[in-house]
Amino acid sequence: MMGSPVSHLLAGFCVWVVLGWVGGSVPNLGPAEQEQNHYLAQLFGLYGENGTLTAGGLARLLHSLGLGRVQGLRLGQHGPLTGRAASPAADNSTHRPQNPELSVDVWAGMPLGPSGWGDLEESKAPHLPRGPAPSGLDLLHRLLLLDHSLADHLNEDCLNGSQLLVNFGLSPAAPLTPRQFALLCPALLYQIDSRVCIGAPAPAPPGDLLSALLQSALAVLLLSLPSPLSLLLLRLLGPRLLRPLLGFLGALAVGTLCGDALLHLLPHAQEGRHAGPGGLPEKDLGPGLSVLGGLFLLFVLENMLGLLRHRGLRPRCCRRKRRNLETRNLDPENGSGMALQPLQAAPEPGAQGQREKNSQHPPALAPPGHQGHSHGHQGGTDITWMVLLGDGLHNLTDGLAIGAAFSDGFSSGLSTTLAVFCHELPHELGDFAMLLQSGLSFRRLLLLSLVSGALGLGGAVLGVGLSLGPVPLTPWVFGVTAGVFLYVALVDMLPALLRPPEPLPTPHVLLQGLGLLLGGGLMLAITLLEERLLPVTTEG
């Protein structure tokens, strides 16, 4: 679609010519008249009725051209025009700013004839359409152009100025008179409407199989770092420092998972672009950013309400009602306080010692969201197999997403890898804390992490194969991965952050909010820098 104001004026002039407002009789130019009649027949066949162009047909034609209404385009937004021959530096007249009055001055300096478009008869002496005496080859070429049929225009291309002039039997070296330019207007108008000069965006070339496999393998190796890192943190940090760290990591995982799903995976699954031609994010990133903003806003509001509730900042009527209910339930004459006490069986031998042992060693800390990956309280062997199965399937799906992402590009793989990494660290912390509590050794835990990493590597190879195979399935893999990420973040991890087992102090809540904001901002930065990351990776 031609977007400059000069193009709109040219299209409007073409419509003016087609409607017959130029007036006067057209000189017999041979193939030019025949070419003009062809394009007029095409336009009137599409938008006319019974050989005439009605108001409705004209409205549809203007709508198809992108005319008839203000497009909200400013002159200052136009970049350098492409496809136009470079003018000499000495010719300063071509570098003047586009002024609508310039064309008026040019046409005002021309001698006007009876039709108002200049005297078309004064050019009989120079014979500009014919030029000098045609050679034998030029004459043969013009004779061949006399026979035009509809079949000659079925496979039309985007014609440049020279091709248009040759098709009309005019000399490319001779200047055009206003009448000759009017003859070209139906062809220009038809080409604008048929959009033969608007090329569809070329499909992205398929990624390199070897580089995608190598990058996916390196990413899977990077994702194996949370396992030894979690073991190190469990040994070095105590519960007092581990709890706020787990809250921050859980919020960071929620931000990265939601950010990667909304700002990257879903736009690529819909085969869209992240930003417009000017690199502005409001076109494609607006919905994703609004969802992230709403997520962060509700997170802050719920935590603020929780802090106010636990500090006792409630209306007096509610506190008085609660005090009355508590005194009524604790009344010794009222049996309601005793009715809710559960029955206790007789203590078994050794049960008292077990309770003392449990009171001395509190259960390991579960990270936010780990209840979605809970493995129950079975024996050590059952817990080991549950962890192996759950983590293996989890790493398999993560590897599948990473392989598909690196097949699409380096920035895609980078954002997905960071999202998975931020999620894996608190997940591995919870798993290893539970397994250590069940009595497993560090050596067996490392072996278990190696097995899970091998399954992740297999998933990465499968993701690359599905994306770069004969039938690319990258949009489907991205869509499924986005759904998985949103489910894990919003159903598995976020509820644990909002409903902790005990009230959190204000610094812990602020730390979680910082983690959520940092995760979403990290995904936004990678998305905005995607176009800059692509040339670096291709050159490397």
Swiss-Prot record:
Instruction: Please indicate if the UniProt record lists Transmembrane as a keyword.
Output: yes
Q: Outcome of S374R?
A: Reduced binding to METTL9
Q: In what way is this protein post-translationally modified?
A: Methylated at His-375 by METTL9.
Summarize the subunit comment: Homodimer.
One Pfam match: Zip
* Reported function: Uniporter that transports zinc(2+) into polarized cells of enterocytes, pancreatic acinar and endoderm cells across the basolateral membrane and participates, notably, in zinc excretion from the intestine by the uptake of zinc from the blood into the intestine. The transport mechanism is temperature- and concentration-dependent and saturable. In addition, is also a high affinity copper transporter in vitro. Also may regulate glucose-stimulated insulin secretion (GSIS) in islets primarily through the zinc-activated SIRT1-PPARGC1A axis.
- Protein's cellular compartments: Basolateral cell membrane
Record-given protein name:
Zinc transporter ZIP5
Query: What family does the database annotate?
Result: Belongs to the ZIP transporter (TC 2.A.5) family.
Claim: Zinc is one of the keywords in the record: yes
One GO BP on record is: intracellular monoatomic cation homeostasis
